[in-house]
Every structure is written in C-alpha cells, then in structure tokens.
C-alpha cells in the first residue's frame, strides 16, 4: 500500500485514460451472437420475449411492463434504441438466427472507467443455458478487453433473488444494499450492488471458458461440471 509524504496510506497509482464508449459491434461466440438491437431485424422475434405470451413473473422486477402486440413493441424498441445513455444488444441464437433476449450497457462513467450491464430481458430459452452464459461472457470480455473499463456493475432489486444468484454465479461480487434507493411500480426498492473488477477478470474469464467448452457437455447437452466447479 503506497504512503504519501504525510505518512497516510493512499490508493495504488492507476492509468487515468478514460473508458471507450460502446460501439455496438457484432460479437460472435460459439453459441450466440450479440449485435446492435434493430427494430427491422429483431422485433418479430422479440415479441415472444416482450409480448403477452411471455411469463408474467419475469416482469415483476423489470421497470417496464410487457407489451400487448407488435406495434407496442416497435414503439418500445425504438425508444430503447434512441436512448443516448444506454447501448442495447440483441442476443441471437447462432444456429437459428433468432433473437432470444436483450441487455444493455448503461450508467457509463468513462472518467472512472465504470460501466453497468442492465435491462437484462431473457426468454426462458436463454436462462440457465450455454447461450445465456456465453452472452454474458462475450459482453464482459468486450467491457474489459476492448473498452478498457476497470469496474463492471450489476444491480437488482434486493428481493430479486434469481438475479442476484445469476450475478454471483457469473463472477460478480456482492458489495452491499442501498436502502430505499428507488421508487418503481408504486413500491419501494432496496438495490443490491454487485461488481466485477479488472483484477477479477482473468480468473472469471478462465472459468467462463472452461464451462463453455464443448468438452464440458455430454451428448445430451448436460454439463459435466457446474460453473462454480470450473
């Protein structure tokens, strides 16, 4: 730990080059493809994710409600795409080419190189699958290795236990709860904060790659080792 001329402990020196804004480049993995959200390309597929046939319980902790039809979805997607403070990706099944979900990079602090993944909206076909896990791997790799961020955040309603469990499985570390941080849907929300930092990334990356390896799955697609065991 460095000490200044007054005998006080201070933080380690760090390169203060700002982080790079996302450019929504296409990112291709073994099972999934991330690409810029597009009304023309993705709206029809995403109606199954955002529409009236989506599981009702998936909307409890999301800020927006489901849409009722394609026209409403087109309006919602246009609003998402037009936001200047968020960068939305569609998550594609590499085999079928269909969009199965979306997430965004948001709350971007370039000066301090801090960025958050949020607005995670996955269909059941993505949750707890190789595709869903790889989507998060591809985005984290992009954040740390291409955009040069030091801190990658995940936040959720403190009552949203599946979200917190997912974050911790993926390598995010719980840091604390901000009490009464948000009012939404007419109710209060305590917010759990979790993060992954650049020093964590090499270890987490190795775990992602070991778990995602085809050698980790049998002929029926069942994992041989859990993510935590890799």
List PLM regions with ranges.
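Conserved catalytic-core motifs of GNAT/GCN5-like acyltransferases
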Residues: 173-187
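Glycine-rich acyl-CoA binding loop
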Residues: 132
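Conserved active-site tyrosine of GNAT-family acetyltransferases
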Residues: 166-167, 194
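GNAT-family acyltransferases
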Residues: 1-129, 142, 146, 187-230
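Conserved beta-strand-loop-alpha-helix junction that forms the acyl-donor binding cleft
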Residues: 154-163
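Conserved GNAT acetyl-CoA-binding A-motif
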Residues: 145-155
């Amino acid at each position: 730990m460095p000490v200044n001329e007054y005998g006080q402990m201070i933080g380690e020196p760090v390169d203060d080059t700002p982080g790079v804004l996302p450019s929504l480049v296409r990112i291709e993995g073994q099972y999934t493809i991330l690409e810029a959200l597009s009304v023309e390309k993705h709206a029809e597929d995403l109606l199954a994710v955002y529409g009236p046939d989506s599981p009702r319980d998936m909307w409890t902790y999301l800020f927006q409600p489901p849409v009722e039809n394609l026209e409403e979805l087109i309006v919602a997607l246009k609003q998402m795409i037009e936001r200047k403070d968020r960068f939305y990706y569609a998550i594609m099944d590499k085999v079928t080419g269909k969009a199965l979900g979306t997430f965004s990079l948001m709350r971007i602090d370039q000066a301090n190189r801090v960025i958050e993944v949020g607005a995670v909206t996955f269909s059941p076909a993505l949750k707890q699958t190789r595709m869903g896990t790889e989507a998060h791997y591809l985005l984290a790799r992009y954040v740390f290795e291409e955009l040069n961020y030091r801190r990658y955040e995940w936040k959720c309603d403190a009552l949203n236990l599946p979200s917190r469990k997912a974050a911790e499985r993926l390598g995010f570390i719980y840091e604390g709860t901000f009490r009464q941080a948000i009012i939404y849907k007419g109710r209060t929300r305590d917010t759990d904060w979790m993060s992954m930092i650049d020093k964590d990334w090499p270890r987490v990356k190795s775990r992602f790659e070991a778990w995602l390896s085809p050698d980790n799955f049998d002929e029926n697609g069942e994992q041989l080792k859990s993510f935590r065991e890799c």
